[in-house]
């Protein structure tokens, strides 16, 4: 990825690495992980590509399946040039990505110690549309409410919003989940609290761990250590892990268990008395459902996280991004890459960022 006229901040990680990246995994400080610059770049690109593929794949199913899953006999469109078609005709589909990139842009312009208000003002005054917790936070920021994401002022605080835009935190902290969580502590509370914030912390940690492990079970379980054990979010994801072990060949049985135990939407006004469930934990569970039952298979992961329903573009986006980091851009199957091609040299609307890979001569900070 690169920008027009400036270098993207995630690429700066590669410069500072001096050809290799060394990570001391913070929860196992005796373990050191080293990778080459080219491997790191491949994984970063894989994360952004997987995220974009996922949100595009689930585009026409989002919230059409509430309290039910998409049957196996129902096909989901995917074809050559599909992402470019969607970027041209439906740019607001990519709200999770343009929020992600807004935060990346602030970090590039202001630095890693950028104050909280720089992130808040950036998305509150942006031209793009927002929904739920993000939109409520935008309203609060514009009207001077400082705790813009707190449940007392934002009825969507437990919604999925930060969870779907926390990818950058893990992508910019390879192998360092605690550092990813520190960024999430600063930014995630602008629009979410409680489960909504925990979801972003968890997703960011999974992205971070995907740089240093090819074991999906490890990534899912280790990332959960960033979440308080007494929280309902922790309990929900822990149950998914338990049910996966109990029903290792039947993701639909685990889906039914989730529906029975965690399908209540008690925060978002749009879902309290309706089948809609945009709560972070149930949708995070569908991310994990795809990752565990997909077990490293990109197609299975996409299919399951999408077919689980509810926010079925954002969930495969998160799952695809995490798996894209683990596998690397070069290992994403051709079936999925055909849909992405043509969009790689196209800017995301509302941003100056695109997917084109930096050439060796771009590797400078001048």
Task: Locate the predicted segments by residue.
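Active-site cavity-forming subdomains of large catalytic enzyme subunits
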Residues: 41, 49, 99, 104-201, ...
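Bacterial N-terminal signal peptides that target proteins for export
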Residues: 2-9
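Bacterial N-terminal signal peptides
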Residues: 11-19
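Conserved small/polar residues in nucleotide/adenosyl-binding loops
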Residues: 355-360
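C-terminal motif of bacterial Sec signal peptides marking the signal peptidase cleavage site
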Residues: 22-23
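Accessory "access/gating" subregions that flank catalytic or transport cores
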Residues: 150-157, 171, 176, 189, ...
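Active-site-surrounding "flap" and adjacent substrate/cofactor-binding loops of secreted or lumenal enzymes
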Residues: 60-90, 97
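Catalytic phosphate/nucleotide-handling subdomain of diverse soluble enzymes
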Residues: 291-354
